[in-house]
Amino acid sequence: MIPLQHGLILAAVLFVLGFTCLVLRRNLLFMLIGLEIMINSAALAFVVGGSYWGQTDGQIMYILAISLAAAEASIGLALLLQLHRHRQNLNIDTVSEMRG
């Protein structure tokens, strides 16, 4: 069995990597990937904690996090396609430009 500290450290490293990708990248696709990494790292922390204490709550939260990630990915990819159709660009800075 993997120790609790190792699993939580891995989840924290993945969360920091996802947050870094979310903050530093200006491409919407990479921002969505970073957000997915963050959601999966939180789900990993739930599973590791649940297996350490012998509870099934961590696995239930994992199922909830995966369904949340699927909904977020479908909405995000739909927005990504619309942005690419209208701007021919996935740069998030083009969205904040005002028309006129």
From Swiss-Prot:
Keyword Lyase: no
TM stretches of this protein: 4-24, 28-48, 60-80
Pfam families: Oxidored_q2 (PF00420)
Subcellular location: Cell inner membrane
GO cellular component, one term: NADH dehydrogenase complex
UniProt-recorded Gene Ontology molecular function terms: NADH:ubiquinone reductase (non-electrogenic) activity; quinone binding
Major place of residence: membrane
Manganese listed as a keyword: no
Membrane-related topology note: Multi-pass membrane protein
EC number: 7.1.1.-
Leader sequence residues: none
Listed GO biological process terms: ATP synthesis coupled electron transport
Record InterPro entries: NADH_UbQ_OxRdtase_chain4L/K (IPR001133), NUOK/Mnh_C1-like (IPR039428)
Catalyzed reaction equations: a quinone + NADH + 5 H(+)(in) = a quinol + NAD(+) + 4 H(+)(out)
Protein keywords: Cell inner membrane, Cell membrane, Membrane, NAD, Quinone, Translocase, Transmembrane, Transmembrane helix, Transport, Ubiquinone
Gene3D superfamilies: 1.10.287.3510
Family indicated by similarity: Belongs to the complex I subunit 4L family.
Subunit architecture: NDH-1 is composed of 13 different subunits. Subunits NuoA, H, J, K, L, M, N constitute the membrane sector of the complex.
PANTHER family documented for this protein: NADH-UBIQUINONE OXIDOREDUCTASE CHAIN 4L (PTHR11434:SF16), NADH-UBIQUINONE OXIDOREDUCTASE SUBUNIT ND4L (PTHR11434)
Stated role: NDH-1 shuttles electrons from NADH, via FMN and iron-sulfur (Fe-S) centers, to quinones in the respiratory chain. The immediate electron acceptor for the enzyme in this species is believed to be ubiquinone. Couples the redox reaction to proton translocation (for every two electrons transferred, four hydrogen ions are translocated across the cytoplasmic membrane), and thus conserves the redox energy in a proton gradient.
Protein name (Swiss-Prot/TrEMBL): NADH-quinone oxidoreductase subunit K
Annotated organism of origin: Proteus mirabilis (strain HI4320)
